[in-house]
Regions:
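Extracytoplasmic/secreted cell-surface and envelope-processing proteins
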Residues: 23-28, 32, 59-62, 83-86, ...
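Surface-exposed amphipathic alpha-helices with a cationic face
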Residues: 2, 31, 35-47, 51, ...
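Aromatic-lined carbohydrate-recognition surfaces of secreted/lumenal glycan-active proteins
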Residues: 40-61, 107-118, 156-168
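Distinct, well-ordered alpha-helical segments
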Residues: 1-5, 28-33, 38, 55-71
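Active-site groove signature of glycoside hydrolases
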Residues: 2-30, 62, 112
């Protein structure tokens, strides 16, 4: 990352160190002091902004303030579907969480690094307990349109999660929710939001 950042600064605009390494439910947690040392090392060796990406339930914890102070900007993951929201309240909840994190870290740029809506889920396991909202292409389109209307109006930088379905993710069952967050299917055929993208753009 250091080499690439220094070699291609006109192409790479920032460097992210670690993904969901602080949040309590992560299966690959990294101690704050360890992550801090990684961030400092990279910051000392590049001129690009440096950050780490994590769930809102990491950025709202006092024990992670050291990391928030160290990064150049915050990358926030906020998934209303995983939080048990129905589609009708999903954008309001996302806005609420963003504002809460912004209130905690007033002097930081906050980039929403992950948000979206899955198009399938399995009816067994943890996802069956946590996910209450209906999944599907109609619901995904509805969430993205509502989210973008808010985020674009407020000039909030964001990444939609995600471009393509990833069939290798999660468990073996084909309906496993982790496989189905893409705006396109794994074979690159578009889902409903992307099928209608031109009409959405022309209307706005």
């Amino acid at each position: 990352a250091i080499y690439l950042g220094n070699e291609y600064p006109s192409v790479i605009n920032s460097i992210n160190i670690g993904n969901e390494t602080l949040v309590f439910w992560s299966d690959h947690r990294v101690p704050v002091d360890t992550l801090s040392s990684y961030l400092k090392y990279v910051k000392n060796n590049v001129s690009l902004p440096v950050t780490t990406a994590d769930d809102f339930n990491a950025w709202n914890r006092e024990e992670n303030k050291k990391i928030a102070d160290l990064v150049d900007f915050i990358v926030l993951h906020v998934h209303p579907l995983w939080a048990g929201l129905q589609i009708e309240g999903s954008v309001d909840w996302t806005r609420k969480i963003y504002n809460e994190i912004k209130d905690i870290h007033k002097d930081k740029l906050i980039v929403i690094g992950e948000t979206g809506w899955a198009t399938q889920k399995h009816n067994q396991g943890l996802q069956a307990k946590l996910i209450k909202g209906k999944t599907g292409e109609v619901e995904q389109e509805q969430f993205i349109l509502g989210f973008k209307k808010w985020a674009d109006t407020k000039n909030i930088p964001y990444f939609l999660f995600e471009v393509f379905d990833e069939n290798w993710k999660g468990g073996d069952h084909p309906n496993e929710v982790e496989k189905h967050w893409g705006l396109f299917k794994a074979d690159r055929t578009p889902k409903l939001y992307m099928k209608n993208y031109k009409s959405h753009y022309e209307q706005n």
